[in-house]
């Protein structure tokens, strides 16, 4: 049985895949192109179609997830607008650096090594900090813009950056103030890395918002997704003009992610912030291993390594999304038990 020239089995696969990635996307503010594009390439789609369809999927999913985070009060629009401005400038400079390396013939090697080390480094750092229990992640889940974040809830690096009182000062969600120039500097740095590595950068921005600026983890996720709406929208529009976006891929993926993104976003208001950081770190560490395996397969001309890499990525996605879902259900059950005990008393 086929629909629009695509087998029902493949459509069902895309819907399930979209649900899985949607949960991760709504929960972490990353994972779309990181997972979709490699999967489509291994399935035999042309690189342009894979990239374009991946971007269109990221755009649609980020809109859905951002709306849910907005309902939970987890999007700082002012910070998001500033991050977009700084990130855009950084991406342009990063692209210049990448083009220079391409002219020298070093681009593939340098970018691959940098990508693996960055994924692994951020993953190790976030996991270590979460297990140490330093910095609880700011406000508890549903964030009141006028509520204050205590110093104990803000990472030391962010406290140091906040101490530079260079005007103008911007008041962010959580009641703390940060210099406009510090925000733009962090945004520029994350954009520089994104442009240099040729990736969306969600895995860079989310920890940067928390560890460098001091934004509560759920708000960091929601604000990161708000930024992705714009970057994904522009990329999708440009590729759609050339007809590279394959709707037979995008529509079933979005059908699954429409539910997954809302579930993932809702889970950020239930799951402990320490657990969020641990899951995020584990996802990046496994992603680093998968990318390293794929690159080694290319160097030694072992095609099967691409499949092994994809299995690692999909396995990581299944494992982490399952852990997220389990943690959210556990929190709901504990809350229900608590209410039942209170009612009996």
Regions picked out by a protein language model, each given a short descriptive name:
Residues 1-103, 109-112, 118-120, 124-131, ...:
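Small-residue-rich hydrophobic segments that form or flank transmembrane alpha-helices
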Residues 7, 150, 155, 173, ...:
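Serine/threonine-rich low-complexity intrinsically disordered regions
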Residues 74, 140-152, 242, 286, ...:
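Alpha-helical membrane-embedding segments
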Residues 114-121, 125, 298-344:
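Transmembrane alpha-helices
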Residues 131-161:
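Flexible cytoplasmic inter-helical loops of multi-pass small-molecule transporters
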Residues 266-312:
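A contiguous, mid-protein "functional segment" used to position or interact
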């Amino acid at each position: 049985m086929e629909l629009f020239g695509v087998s029902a089995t493949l459509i069902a696969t895309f819907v399930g895949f979209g649900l899985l990635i949607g949960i991760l996307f709504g929960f972490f503010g990353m994972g779309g192109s990181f997972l979709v594009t490699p999967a489509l390439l291994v399935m035999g789609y042309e690189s342009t179609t894979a990239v374009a369809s991946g971007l269109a999927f990221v755009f649609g999913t980020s809109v859905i997830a951002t709306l849910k985070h907005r309902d939970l009060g987890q999007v700082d629009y002012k910070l998001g607008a500033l991050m977009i401005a700084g990130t855009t400038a950084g991406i342009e400079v990063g692209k210049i650096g990448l083009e220079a390396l391409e002219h020298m013939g070093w681009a593939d090697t340098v970018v691959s090594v940098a990508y693996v080390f960055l994924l692994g480094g951020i993953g190790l750092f976030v996991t270590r900090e979460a297990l140490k229990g330093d910095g609880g992640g700011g406000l508890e889940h549903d964030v009141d813009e006028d509520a204050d974040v205590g110093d104990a809830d803000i990472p030391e690096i962010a406290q140091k950056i906040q101490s530079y009182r260079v005007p103008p000062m911007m008041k962010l969600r959580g009641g703390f103030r940060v210099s406009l120039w510090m925000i733009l500097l962090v945004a520029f740095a994350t954009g520089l890395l994104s442009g240099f590595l040729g990736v969306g950068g969600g895995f860079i921005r989310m920890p940067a918002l928390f560890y460098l600026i001091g934004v509560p983890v759920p708000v960091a996720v929601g604000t990161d997704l708000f930024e992705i709406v714009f970057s994904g929208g522009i990329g999708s529009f440009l590729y759609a003009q050339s007809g590279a976006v394959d709707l037979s891929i995008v529509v079933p993926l979005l059908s699954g992610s429409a539910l997954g993104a809302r579930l993932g976003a809702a889970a950020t208001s239930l799951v402990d912030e320490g657990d969020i950081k641990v899951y995020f770190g584990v996802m990046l560490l496994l992603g680093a291993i998968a990318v390293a395996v794929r690159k080694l397969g290319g160097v030694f001309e072992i095609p099967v390594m691409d499949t092994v890499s994809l299995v690692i990525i999909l396995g990581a996605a299944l494992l982490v999304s399952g852990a997220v879902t389990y943690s959210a259900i556990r929190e709901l059950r504990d809350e229900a038990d608590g209410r039942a005990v209170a009612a009996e008393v």
